[in-house]
């Protein structure tokens, strides 16, 4: 049995866009190009609308297909694996301690961090709902841990907006590309909610899209944490050679990827 961490860009998304492209093209041909239905101005409007629609859908289909190949755990680039392993190496937990992975998805980061801390326990939490609920599930997490032979993990339901854990519950906290997907909430407040459950002296490694447009002034956020007594706080640009280069990050829509690491 092999682990199946799935893809951050599911095939169903690619197939859906491809299907939409075909439908738009057929509508373009039937309603516009052939003149079989419309004539004159209505035909011209149909040509423009469905022609542009076809091109837009074709672009996004190609882009999503490229993303799928890039993120594929079994593909050539394996960017997801690179990011997971690169983030997990910053997760350090004392023997007997417990770490938390917020928004664990299919369990990849939780399991990798557990492997690196065999005498500690990792907890993965997620709401496992929305657009990815058919792909990322609690059972998939548990199956992946079993396939990897990792026993020092457990998975539970938990929302990143209001984590179901008391203050200072964990010796380490981590997360990967979660907060930018949560609409309607201040991203710095989401980060603080995760850090709330971290013990004094605990470590954190949080990877996400942290551009000013998404997260505000992160340099000021770092200064705030230091002023509150955090022992160490650093921001690492992972789109500038660590996980990917600037050109690749721009093409993938991952510009602004940052790793927030430190010790409380």
Describe every region a protein language model picked out.
Residues 188-200:
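A short glycine-rich, Lys/Arg-flanked "PGG" loop and its adjoining helix->strand segment in the class I
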Residues 94, 161-173:
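A short acidic, Gly/Pro-enriched loop at the edge of an enzyme's catalytic core
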Residues 201-208:
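Conserved beta-strand signature within the Rossmann-like core of class I S-adenosyl-L-methionine
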Residues 106-118:
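Conserved SAM-binding loop of SAM-dependent methyltransferases across substrates and taxa
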Residues 117, 182-184, 198-200:
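Helix-to-beta-strand junctions that scaffold the AdoMet/dcAdoMet cofactor pocket
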Residues 95-105, 123:
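Conserved class I S-adenosyl-L-methionine
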Residues 12-16, 61-85:
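Class I SAM-dependent methyltransferase Rossmann-like catalytic core
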Residues 228-229, 242-264:
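Core SAM-dependent methyltransferase catalytic element
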């Amino acid at each position: 049995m092999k682990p199946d961490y799935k893809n951050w860009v599911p095939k169903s998304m690619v197939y859906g866009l491809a299907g939409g492209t075909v439908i738009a093209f057929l509508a373009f041909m039937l309603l516009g190009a052939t003149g079989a239905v419309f004539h004159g101005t209505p035909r011209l409007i149909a040509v423009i609308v469905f022609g542009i629609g076809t091109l837009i859908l074709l672009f996004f289909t190609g882009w999503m297909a490229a993303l799928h190949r890039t993120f594929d755990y079994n593909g050539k680039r394996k960017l997801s694996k690179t990011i997971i392993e690169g983030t997990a190496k910053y997760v350090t937990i004392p023997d007997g301690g417990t770490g938390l992975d917020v928004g664990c998805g299919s369990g990849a980061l939780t399991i990798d961090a557990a492997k690196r801390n065999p005498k500690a326990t990792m907890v993965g939490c997620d709401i496992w709902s929305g657009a990815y609920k058919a792909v990322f599930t609690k059972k998939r997490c548990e199956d992946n841990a079993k396939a990897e032979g990792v026993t020092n993990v457990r998975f539970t339901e938990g929302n990143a907006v209001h984590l179901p854990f008391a203050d200072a519950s964990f010796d380490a906290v981590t997360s990967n590309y979660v907060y930018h997907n949560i609409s309607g909430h201040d991203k710095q407040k989401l980060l603080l909610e995760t850090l709330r459950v971290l013990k004094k002296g605990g470590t954190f490694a949080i990877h996400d899209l942290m551009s000013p447009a998404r997260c505000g002034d992160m340099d000021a956020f770092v200064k705030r944490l230091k002023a509150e007594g955090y022992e160490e706080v650093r921001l690492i640009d992972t789109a500038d050679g660590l996980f990917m280069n600037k050109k690749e990050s721009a093409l993938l829509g991952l510009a602004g990827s940052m790793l927030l690491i430190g010790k409380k």
